[in-house]
């Protein structure tokens, strides 16, 4: 699935269509060398004169946010599934931390860290952060399946769910690493990988800037231009 900009008599339009990997002009650069999310292999895609046949055009719409079924379908499923992915990362971080402190012993207290009140508080805090993520994702997913009309608030609320999940996961993994101590800093520790993966949530759509701009437009309307 690709999209491009077309200049038409009615003004600029966004065109969404399907191409095949075998199509002439399509190429992928093997450049996915990132801090985290390495398994996704999200390489740079090059489109050099690629032609999309008319039968593979999904929709043509005005640029920007749109209620077009194709645009909404792509965006809604992407944001919900991305939010659920980060929820899974955060919940796994809590599990790993709980397993770790159950075997890590405290020299000071002569027992495992799972009996240390401060460590117990930290892991409980991580779990509480993640506990608030799931309901928002599930409600949005149910409303998508049921065809609920949320009007103009749909796009901002979908972005908010992804953002909430990503930010919560980052805070959760940090708490888990603090609870586990320096060993979690090693690349061989699962929490190290989870932390690197959680950082990707800062950059994936919708980021903080576009999220806040969308909510400001929803609540306050567009910015008024000075006369």
Regions found by a protein language model. Name each.
Residues 95, 99-102, 131, 135-138, ...:
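Charged/polar positions within long, soluble alpha-helices
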Residues 182-227:
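Glycine-rich phosphate/cofactor-binding loops in nucleotide/flavin-utilizing enzymes
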Residues 1-27:
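A short core secondary-structure module
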Residues 88, 124-131, 159, 163-170, ...:
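Generic structural signal for well-ordered, non-transmembrane alpha-helical segments
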Residues 131-164, 174-185:
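C-terminal helix-coil-helix/basic helical segment that borders enzyme active sites and/or dimer interfaces
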Residues 34-130:
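Glycine-rich beta->alpha junctions and the first turn(s) of the following alpha-helix
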Residues 4-8, 32-37:
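A generic local secondary-structure boundary/capping motif
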Residues 106-110, 150-151, 188:
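Flexible, glycine/charged-enriched surface loops at secondary-structure junctions
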């Amino acid at each position: 699935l690709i999209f491009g900009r077309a200049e038409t008599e009615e003004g600029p339009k966004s065109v969404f269509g399907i191409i095949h990997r075998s199509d002439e002009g399509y190429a992928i650069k093997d450049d996915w060398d990132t801090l985290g999310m390495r398994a996704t292999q999200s390489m740079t895609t090059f489109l050099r004169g690629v032609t999309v046949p008319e039968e593979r055009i999904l929709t043509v719409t005005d640029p920007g946010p749109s209620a077009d079924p194709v645009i909404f379908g792509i965006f809604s499923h992407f944001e919900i599934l991305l939010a659920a992915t980060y929820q899974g990362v955060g919940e796994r971080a809590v599990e790993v931390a709980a397993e770790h402190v159950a075997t890590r012993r405290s020299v000071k207290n002569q027992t495992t860290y799972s009996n240390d009140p401060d460590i117990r508080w930290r892991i409980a805090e991580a779990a509480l952060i993640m506990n608030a993520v799931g309901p928002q994702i599930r409600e949005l997913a149910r409303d998508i399946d049921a065809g609920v009309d949320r009007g103009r608030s749909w796009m901002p609320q979908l972005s908010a769910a992804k953002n909430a999940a990503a930010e919560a996961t980052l805070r959760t993994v940090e708490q888990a690493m603090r609870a586990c101590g320096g060993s979690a800093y090693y690349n061989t520790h699962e929490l190290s990988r989870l932390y690197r993966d959680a950082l990707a949530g800062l950059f994936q759509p919708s980021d903080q800037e576009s999220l806040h701009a969308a909510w400001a437009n929803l609540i306050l309307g567009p910015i008024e231009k000075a006369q």
